[in-house]
UniProtKB/Swiss-Prot annotation:
Ser-9 is likely to be phosphorylated by CaMK1/4 and/or PKA. It is probable that the phosphorylation plays a role in short-term synaptic enhancement (STE). Ser-36 and/or Ser-42 are likely to be phosphorylated by MAPK; the phosphorylation may play a dual role in regulating both functional synapse formation and their activity-dependent short-term plasticity. The gene is SYN. Neuronal phosphoprotein that coats synaptic vesicles. Plays a role in the establishment of functional synaptic connections and in the regulation of their activity-dependent short-term plasticity. GO terms for biological process: neurotransmitter secretion. InterPro entries: ATP-grasp, ATP_grasp_subdomain_1, PreATP-grasp_dom_sf, Synapsin, Synapsin_ATP-bd_dom, Synapsin_pre-ATP-grasp_dom. PANTHER family: SYNAPSIN (PTHR10841:SF17). Changing residue 9 to A: Impairs post-tetanic potentiation (PTP) at synapses. It comes from Helix pomatia (Roman snail). Keywords: Cell projection, Phosphoprotein, Synapse. This is Synapsin. Pfam families: Synapsin, Synapsin_C.
Length: 496
């Protein structure tokens, strides 16, 4: 009996089945181990190539890597009196991109621009007594300093930013047009001609390319503006011909143009500003009695915005392709008449107690522009081609069967497993182990070649078998087990 127990042990039976490589025994083990796989598995492999491909695809493409460099660099060109970084703190672009604020003055910048790689800026600044140098690639510009003034001209930096295609507020095209005040005034003349002098009251101004023609000025007193300057620089009040002659002799030593306009005995200056869709208007009057209200001590008062001032700002904001930040400067004479004298861009002065609000408005406009103009380049998926080739394999389960076919053919096994399907299996969809290169839906059992119609039965259960396929499979496995037991009994009693 002990001999019979040893002979009837499952280990011996499995050993005989493995030595003979009888497919039914393999089918019994697979059937008892777990649920039916979606595609036939090779007896020597536990995972099909399709399963491996699915795991590989989901691991490489499904998980989106997080980059540490998810930020855009904003370069603010302004003095150190204002810390612009606090107005962008905590703000995000495109959902999760940070805004890195770099602030410097024009005098601290050097740059190099390439048509392919863009603009690289080097900042050499002195902070807390220490000289610091850092490099960056700006994605956006906010220009709060005058590009050109009485003693400086930073147009070479402006050209470099334009060469690298760096967007800005206002646009670099607009900033370049603001390099000469007579050029801007010429645009205002066009607006006046279109709207009439009553609607757009531009001051009467005369341009001189050099000093020679200045002596033919009409009447006095007048104001002479030499070259391009801000904050009251380059302006002089002339009361008579002798003073004008002296001024003309000084201009002979300079290669600069000049403009003249009648002197207006003013009550106050008018400052109208527009930041996006926000409007403000101020009155400014000199306390010291200086005819230049923007120099020395002055009284400032914010006044309600009327439709006339709003029209001025709207018309000027359309200059040079559009100005996001613009101000209109005017004076009102003691006769009650208004005179528009100039327009400024993004470098305009912020006045009054609303300066913090104005800076927040500018920062919000910068964020909106960056959101629109600084969209990150879409990263190409490195696994795009592999995903297209792996996905059909996982869905159709065709490639795993083909990959296992050479090894099975080398072991003397048939190529097809679906031709000898049981009647229960034939009612459901055909198995995925059909003819190579032909989809399951287009390969009915009756159309298979005759030389593949009688292969040995394959016990691999499939997920595409009909509901009656599993009982048929189980009964067939039991018959195969009984055959093995008969062979074992015959061997035992034959030896006895």
């Amino acid at each position: 009996m002990n001999f019979l127990r040893r002979r009837f042990s499952s280990g011996d039976l499995q050993g005989e089945a493995n030595e003979k490589e009888d497919p039914p025994n393999v089918g019994i083990l697979n059937f008892k181990k777990g649920p039916s796989p979606s595609a036939p598995n090779s007896p020597s492999k536990s995972a099909s190539p399709a399963t491996i491909g699915q795991k590989l695809f989901s691991g490489t493409v499904g998980v989106k890597p997080v980059s540490k460099d998810r930020y855009k660099t904003l370069l603010v060109i302004d003095g150190q009196h204002t810390d612009w970084s606090k107005y962008f703190k905590g703000k995000k672009l495109f959902g999760d991109w940070d805004v890195k604020v770099e602030q410097a003055e024009f005098s601290e910048l050097n740059l190099a621009s390439n048509s392919e790689t863009g603009t690289t800026v080097e900042i050499q600044a002195i902070r807390n007594g220490n000289k610091t140098t850092r490099s960056l690639k700006p994605d956006f510009l906010l220009i709060r300093q005058h590009v050109r003034d009485a003693k400086v001209d930073w147009r070479h930096l402006l050209l470099g930013f334009r060469y690298g295609g760096v967007p800005s507020i206002n646009s670099l095209t607009a900033e370049f047009n603001f390099l000469d005040k007579p050029w801007v005034f010429a645009q205002l003349i066009d607006i006046q001609k279109r709207l009439s002098k009553d609607v757009f009251p531009l001051i009467d101004q005369t341009y001189f390319s050099n000093h020679e023609e200045m002596l033919n000025s009409p009447k006095f007193p007048l104001v002479v503006k030499i070259g391009h300057a801000h904050r009251g620089l380059g302006k002089i009040k002339v009361d008579n011909v002798q003073t004008l002659e002296d001024l003309a002799s000084v201009m002979a030593t300079m290669s600069s143009y000049a403009t003249t306009e009648p002197f207006i005995d003013s009550k106050y200056d008018i400052h109208v500003q527009k930041i996006g869709t926000n409007y403000k208007a101020y009155l400014r009057k000199s306390i010291a009695g200086n005819w230049k209200a923007n120099t020395g001590s002055a009284m400032l008062e914010q006044i309600p915005m009327d439709e006339r001032f709003k029209l001025w700002a709207d018309e000027c904001s359309q200059l040079f392709g559009g100005l996001d930040v613009v101000s209109v400067e005017a004076i009102q004479g003691k006769d009650g008449r208004d005179h528009i004298i100039e327009v400024n861009g993004s470098s305009m002065a912020l006045l009054g107690e609303a300066q913090e609000e104005d800076r927040r408005l500018i920062s919000e406009m910068v964020m909106a522009k960056m959101q629109m103009m600084c969209k990150p380049a879409q990263q190409p998926l490195s696994k795009a081609s592999s995903s297209q080739s792996i996905t059909p394999q996982a869905n159709g389960a065709q490639k795993p069967v083909l990959a296992a076919s050479p090894s099975r053919q080398a072991q003397g096994r048939p190529l097809d497993t679906s031709a000898q399907a049981t009647p229960g299996q034939a009612r459901g969809p055909p198995s995925s182990g059909g003819l190579p290169g032909v989809s399951n839906s287009q390969t009915p059992l009756s159309n298979q070649p005759s030389h593949l119609s009688n292969p040995p039965p394959q016990p691999f259960p499939t997920s595409t078998s009909g509901p009656q396929g599993l009982p048929r499979m189980a009964s067939k496995d039991e018959e195969d087990t009984m055959k093995n037991l008969r062979k074992t009994f015959a061997g035992i009693f034959g030896d006895v």
